[in-house]
Amino acid sequence: MTRPTSPLPSSPRWTGAAPEQEMFQTYSKEEYAVRTNRHYEQPPEFFFPILGGEWNVYSCNLWEQATTDTESQEAKLDLFAKLMHLQPGQRILDVGCAWGGPLVYLCKTYGVTGVGLTLSPTQKWYAEQRAAQHQVDVQILECNWEDFQDNQGFEAVYTDEAIVHFTNLGEFFAKVHSLLRPGGCMLNKECHFTSSRYNQHLTRANVFNHEIFGLTGSYRTLADELMLVDQNGFETRIIHQIDLENYRRTADRWLSNMYQHREQLVALVGDDYYRRFRTYLKLVRKTWNGTKMTLDAVVSYKV
């Protein structure tokens, strides 16, 4: 099976003064894919040494008991399984499955079957290789969630720091509701502003972070998310707040891995992108020193 290759468009940048720019930019599905893939179509060989571990999880992991990248990744995924009450034979959907690590781990460890959605052909290819390597029943689709069709249903649908990219979040929750079997579970782990004041205008640091992801970030307050969950046929049963020290340690590990593998990474993506990504991780680390954001896993059930 041949690994796909695709040309990367130039990195999108804000124009004008940063404080005048707003979040929740609206793009066509085609442009949205191009913008996010400016990041996610970078070589996996760039991301994997940075993220580390067996499962290459590109989001905050849990460090209360863990001493290695793999242990921290598995601790977070085990928490997801506990919150979703996963049982053997169930069917789950990962929206924004990246290179397939979390979905493959959950299927392998908990005896479930899974479907993963990604917009990146390279991520799809690697996720499929990983699923085959671990001999799990996983289907990976290069598909926008809006276009995804399914007639079997799922016991659980989850996202891990993915809904920040969904401008039309209410429509996403309605879609999930239609995909879940009766009594099914939706889990969304995401970063939330502690006040609606913070999502009105962007600081230069915010703007830089959004440039990395093609200007597709749309952070909300937890209250805003819960309102949309309620309006689209769910009842929220668990709000699990994650200690921000876990994100600080995750970012520290990623930065340490970047420095350790600098020569290899620069050879892959060039010095400019290496420096920009390192600056991005430093800003992520700085974000979690403040009080403007929380990190929460929201577990809701279809009613």
What are these regions (language model features)?
Residues Q133-D147:
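Conserved SAM-binding strand-loop segment of SAM-dependent methyltransferases
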Residues M1-F48:
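N-terminal auxiliary segments of SAM/dcSAM-dependent transferases
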Residues W99-Y110:
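Conserved SAM-binding loop of SAM-dependent methyltransferases across substrates and taxa
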